[in-house]
Amino acid sequence: MSKVLIVFGSSTGNTESIAQKLEELIAAGGHEVTLLNAADASAENLADGYDAVLFGCSAWGMEDLEMQDDFLSLFEEFNRIGLAGRKVAAFASGDQEYEHFCGAVPAIEERAKELGATIIAEGLKMEGDASNDPEAVASFAEDVLKQL
């Protein structure tokens, strides 16, 4: 059994719904899962005690990538989380009208790799909440479960 932390930043509830569904699916796979809103998170050694960390963040932006405010504060301190040697995956909810649709996914993956993490699943990019594409959420969870 692995210990998995799911940290999310959500303004409208869409990313939170994805995080909650992932929590349910990964726990059903026999793993211990902690769900944490980025608004309640402190970066300092956040990943300690966890085998894997899943990060979820809504994002948008026409010219520049804009991340959800609570998550952005955490993202700016990623170097303090303790990601070296950890398994990481990213997911996001967004609006395809924006140039940076779900742009948080590649930003999170790139930064996590720079800090020594291993990306264990292709990032999940969704329009709206988990109910819009439950198969995509389930497939992402299965990919994560295979690497735990």
Curated annotation (Swiss-Prot):
Keywords: Electron transport, Flavoprotein, FMN, Transport
Secreted listed as a keyword: no
Protein name: Flavodoxin
A GO molecular function held by the record: electron transfer activity
Function text: Low-potential electron donor to a number of redox enzymes.
Organism: Desulfovibrio desulfuricans
Superkingdom assignment: Bacteria
Similarity field: Belongs to the flavodoxin family.
Signal peptide: none
Record-linked PANTHER family: FLAVODOXIN 1, FLAVODOXIN 2
Cofactor list: FMN
